[in-house]
């Protein structure tokens, strides 16, 4: 994840914006679905260089977005703004997005990108876990959050009885010489939304 500030607003004169870039992740599975080890789920995954979501955002009076994934970005921004009682809005530009419903964590990465952009624009003092909880992300796996925060190969410790977000317990660099090839089936969409929870 990269965050940069100091973008001139194309929407409102004088507003400074932020740019957030975050990449996809592969979730390689859970290792304790029923909690026999004292924590449920626990998983391993890896962050990828591409595909990525690139979001630029500026303070605005309302909520707007342009680009692929605009509706999703607006929905997340409104949900988060309501949760923190934000009085302002956000104008967003998406120059690229992770393919939705392809098993690459596009929803989590979008939520974190929008949330961290809002945090930087309005100095909300939110961290990644705050954004995840307020947007309903990271409830079963911490891989998407770990990919956003630190990248590499990630293992999360699963959810304990008092754990809201599964913590990253191990992380390593992914060898640069190794390659991952993604093959997409554009005729079918992966499980998402309520289907994943069942």
Spell out what each predicted region is.
Residues 38, 54, 112, 116, ...:
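N-terminal low-complexity, intrinsically disordered patches enriched in charged
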Residues 1-102, 106, 119-128, 184-189:
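ATP-binding N-lobe of GHMP and related small-molecule kinases
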Residues 96-120, 139-148:
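Glycine/serine-rich anion-binding loops at beta->alpha junctions
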């Amino acid at each position: 994840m990269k965050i940069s500030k100091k973008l001139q607003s194309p929407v409102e004169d004088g507003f400074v914006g932020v740019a957030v870039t975050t990449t996809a992740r592969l979730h390689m599975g859970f290792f304790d679905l029923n909690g026999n080890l004292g924590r449920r789920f626990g998983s391993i995954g890896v962050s990828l260089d591409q595909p990525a979501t690139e979001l630029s955002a500026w303070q605005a009076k309302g909520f707007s977005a342009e680009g692929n994934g605009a509706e999703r970005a607006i929905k997340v921004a409104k949900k988060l703004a309501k949760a923190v009682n934000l009085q302002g809005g956000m104008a967003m530009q998406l120059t690229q997005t992770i393919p939705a419903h392809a098993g690459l964590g596009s929803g989590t990465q979008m939520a974190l990108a929008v949330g961290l952009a809002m945090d930087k624009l309005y100095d909300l003092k939110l961290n990644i876990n705050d954004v995840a909880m307020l947007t309903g992300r990271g409830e079963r796996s911490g891989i998407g959050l770990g990919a956003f925060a630190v990248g590499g190969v990630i293992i999360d410790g699963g959810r304990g009885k008092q754990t809201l977000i599964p913590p990253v317990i191990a992380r390593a660099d992914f060898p640069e010489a190794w390659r991952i090839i993604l093959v997409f089936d554009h005729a079918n969409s992966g499980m998402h939304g309520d289907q994943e929870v069942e």
